[in-house]
């Protein structure tokens, strides 16, 4: 059934965080329905921002080259995070994660009931991170286990300190949960 699919994409992390442009792919029937909804919700699209993106991204080749530049900047940051998780957390079995092959986040799934406490301990130590359960609707993670790490902003030197604090906070939260 072609009317079951709505596929979305955005340039938000590629160009201007929070000010990217988005696209939607769907069936003709779904598109007609969405156009009716959107017609009521907005007077006009931000055409200046759309033009800004067209001029900046230019074409597929230029966009792919830009993404390679992003990868070169982000790769050492992701390596830093993954290296610390593998060294400090993997042997303990208190969390799991996937090694991303793209994107801007590492999603860490702790043992149930550890995410909020882990981030509270991080905050006490001076490290602010995205809220626990941010990947869930309304930020409500029924298992209190999901933490999204976004390593793109800090330089690697600061990231090394922050991820060490994160790992130690997760260990402490696990010990508290176990009553040790």
Name what the model sees in each region.
Residues 42, 124-130, 167-175:
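A common structural junction motif
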Residues 9, 23-25, 99, 105-109, ...:
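Short beta-strand segments
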């Amino acid at each position: 059934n072609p009317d079951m699919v709505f596929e979305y994409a955005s340039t938000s992390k590629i160009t201007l965080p929070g000010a990217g442009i988005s696209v939607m792919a769907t069936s003709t029937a779904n598109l007609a329905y969405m156009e009716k909804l959107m017609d009521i919700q907005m007077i006009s699209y931000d055409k200046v921002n759309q033009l800004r993106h067209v001029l900046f991204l230019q074409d597929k080749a230029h966009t792919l080259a830009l993404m390679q530049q992003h990868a070169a900047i982000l790769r050492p940051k992701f390596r830093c995070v993954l290296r610390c998780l593998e060294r400090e957390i993997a042997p303990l079995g208190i969390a799991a994660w996937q090694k991303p092959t793209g994107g801007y986040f590492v999603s860490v799934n702790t043992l149930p009931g550890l995410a909020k406490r882990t981030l509270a301990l991080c905050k006490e130590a001076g490290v602010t991170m995205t809220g626990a359960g941010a990947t869930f609707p309304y930020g409500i993670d029924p298992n209190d286990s999901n933490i999204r790490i976004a390593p793109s902003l800090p330089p690697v030197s600061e990231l090394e300190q922050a991820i060490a604090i994160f790992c130690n906070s997760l260990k402490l939260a696990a010990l508290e949960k176990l009553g040790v």
